[in-house]
């Protein structure tokens, strides 16, 4: 609990005073191949910080500005996942037509600690998550988004079923 409190206070300091709070809900363990599923509801909170960790690529192309995030995911079958990682975002209009639009593309990658609770057994406490998200920015700068993510232990153990998540989120700037 002390570690969680330290991390929470650290990431809420003025150094990290811009970005988005992301509140999401979705479908956990979505299967597209008809195989057995241990579906649950996925609840997610992330804090996406607006400060760039380091820049790679051309200066005029913000697609390469890597930014940190931290969050927690909980499922209706009591699994929990504490995660930290990097994300980037790019305006889809600017990416394809050169003109800004309200559509934002946000891929992310993170690593975290997973406790399966009564949920799906993913084979290891350490798990990796990759997510692709498209959001629509409203006039007040809030965003609504849909995302697809995959959690896996990257073959750190012999058991590695992985899990797919489809979720919807509401994002509020801070």
Where do the language-model regions lie?
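Cleavable N-terminal export/targeting peptides
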Residues: 1-19
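Repeated loop/turn-to-beta-strand initiation elements of outer-membrane beta-barrel proteins
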Residues: 21, 51-56, 94-96, 103, ...
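Transmembrane beta-strand segments that form the barrel wall of outer-membrane beta-barrel proteins
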Residues: 21-31, 63-75, 107-113, 146-152
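Solvent-exposed loop/turn segments connecting transmembrane beta-strands
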Residues: 30-40, 72-83, 97, 119-125, ...
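Outer-membrane beta-barrel "beta-signal"
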Residues: 41-45, 161-174
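Membrane-embedded beta-strands of outer-membrane beta-barrel proteins
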Residues: 43-47, 84-86, 132, 168
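Residue-level signature of outer-membrane beta-barrel architecture
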Residues: 47-51, 88-94, 136, 150, ...
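Helix-adjacent hinge/juxtasegments
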Residues: 77-107
């Amino acid at each position: 609990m002390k570690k969680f409190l330290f991390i929470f206070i650290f990431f809420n300091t003025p150094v990290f005073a811009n970005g988005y709070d992301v509140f999401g809900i979705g479908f956990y363990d979505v299967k597209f191949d008809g195989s057995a599923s241990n579906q649950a509801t996925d609840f997610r909170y992330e804090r996406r910080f607006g400060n760039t960790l380091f820049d790679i690529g051309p200066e005029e192309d913000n697609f390469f500005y890597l930014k940190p995030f931290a969050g927690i995911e909980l499922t209706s079958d009591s699994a929990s996942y504490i995660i930290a990682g990097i994300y980037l975002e790019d305006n889809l209009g600017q990416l394809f037509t050169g003109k800004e639009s309200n559509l934002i593309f946000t891929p992310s990658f993170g690593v975290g600690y997973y406790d399966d609770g009564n949920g799906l057994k993913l084979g290891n406490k350490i798990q990796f998550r990759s997510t692709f998200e498209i959001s629509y920015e409203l006039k007040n700068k809030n965003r609504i988004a849909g995302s697809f993510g995959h959690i896996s232990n990257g073959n750190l153990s012999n058991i590695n079923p992985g899990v797919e998540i489809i979720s919807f989120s509401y994002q509020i700037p801070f």
